[in-house]
Amino acid sequence: MSTYLIGDIHGCYDELKIILAQVRFDPAVDTLWLTGDLVARGTGSLEVLRLVRSLGDSVQLVLGNHDLHLLAVYAGISRNKPKDRITPLLEAPDADELINWLRRQPVLQVDEEKKLVMAHAGITPQWDLATARQCAREVEAVLKSDSYPLFLDAMYGDMPNNWSPELSGLARLRFSTNVFTRMRYCFPNGQLEMNCKDTPEKASTPLRPWFALPGPVSERYSIVFGHWASLMGQGTPAHIYGLDTGCCWGGELTLLRWEDKAFTRVPSNRQNETSVENPISA
């Protein structure tokens, strides 16, 4: 019985199949944790969702910003961008089933026995675990509800960018969504800065990566996240693991076996990705 954690897949179906085969993943006895952003950029988003859904209870995943964007596109709220390569998924005969399954997935995973927390972008140092769990439940509840299109329409935006227990309604949901799925940098007081995507050595003062600021969760738990491909898994504290290594950009798909902290990496089959948006090419 092993627990495997895999970084952002982004529709890289072939690489996902290869890495699962390499570690001989067995859904009957093993558990697979996925950091979110299952879809977009790669050509196999449809196949990735079908595979992950077929694995049933052996999978523990969290939603990423691209997964939420897919939900918004399918609901007619956001535009389908050709660069995301999700048209085959949107037009698939089982699209309704896949989308309804996806919107019922969590934004936070916690294993108390392993002292392990996973969120796509991370956990703000302003939260303790009880607050993170409460905010996650609120986002998850609205995604499962009939009013989820209203939330998807309102989730885009960078404000509010500072936590207060007094936040309520859509403003509170937007802040929580940004923490769980979009956050990279904070100011020293923990306030979010949502525009900078540079690597830490290029970021302007006084910005700090969220994981560089002490917080109640990181003091007691290991944290696994994705989202930040330009880190290439480097530069985090020893108990915080960034697993997005830019597979959809020509990097690698990374897997971590939790029991012995052993890494497995599969090179992307998109070695010629030259988009100006490529975060790992700089």
Curated annotation (Swiss-Prot):
UniProt-listed InterPro entries: ApaH, Calcineurin-like_PHP_ApaH, Metallo-depent_PP-like
Reactions catalysed: P(1),P(4)-bis(5'-adenosyl) tetraphosphate + H2O = 2 ADP + 2 H(+)
Gene3D superfamilies: 3.60.21.10
Pfam families tied to this protein: Metallophos
GO molecular function, one term: bis(5'-nucleosyl)-tetraphosphatase (symmetrical) activity
NCBIfam families the UniProt entry points to: apaH, PRK00166.1
UniProt family annotation: Belongs to the Ap4A hydrolase family.
Task of the protein: Hydrolyzes diadenosine 5',5'''-P1,P4-tetraphosphate to yield ADP.
Official protein name in the record: Bis(5'-nucleosyl)-tetraphosphatase, symmetrical
Classification of source organism: Bacteria, Pseudomonadati, Pseudomonadota, Gammaproteobacteria, Enterobacterales
